[in-house]
Design a protein with these regions (language model features):
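Domain-level recognition of nuclease-like catalytic cores that cleave nucleotide substrates
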Residues: 5, 76-119
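Short, surface-exposed beta-edge/turn micro-motifs
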Residues: 34-35, 44-45, 76-80
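Active-site-adjacent loop/helix micro-motif of nuclease/hydrolase catalytic cores
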Residues: 54-65
């Protein structure tokens, strides 16, 4: 599987997971811009950058800063980072979500606090 295909599948997995949790999900065309996914529910927006890898996902500091700056310009919005890995036997943390063949984690920035969407 190509890296770009895996990345697209990871975005759809993260988006589908959010949809199952009651969020309306919109994907960035071509994954251009700071957010790959915008999710909306009850006047709250989540601006989400998705990173996927079979190892440790790579993210540049500028990507994080751009996402945070974007969220600062939009009221009631929160910048999140989502890590998507092929399903493995160990969880990254207590809020890891097993979704199909993937293990998904969401972190709110800039605090890097894990988000539990299953509550």
């Amino acid at each position: 599987m190509s890296y770009s295909r895996f990345g697209r599948e990871a975005e759809y997995a993260a988006g589908s997971c959010l949809t199952n949790c009651g969020w309306a999900v919109f994907f960035s065309k071509g994954s251009r811009g700071p957010a790959d996914i915008v999710a909306s529910r009850d006047n709250t927006l989540l601006l989400i950058q998705v990173k996927s890898s079979t190892k440790i996902p790579k993210i540049r500091g500028s990507e994080i800063q751009n996402l945070i700056q974007m969220s600062e310009k939009i009221s009631n919005s929160y910048p999140l980072l989502s890590f998507v890995h092929p399903h493995i036997e160990c969880n990254v943390n207590n809020n890891s979500i097993i979704f199909g063949n993937y293990l998904i984690n969401f972190f709110i920035l800039p605090q890097w606090e894990s988000v539990d969407f299953l509550k």
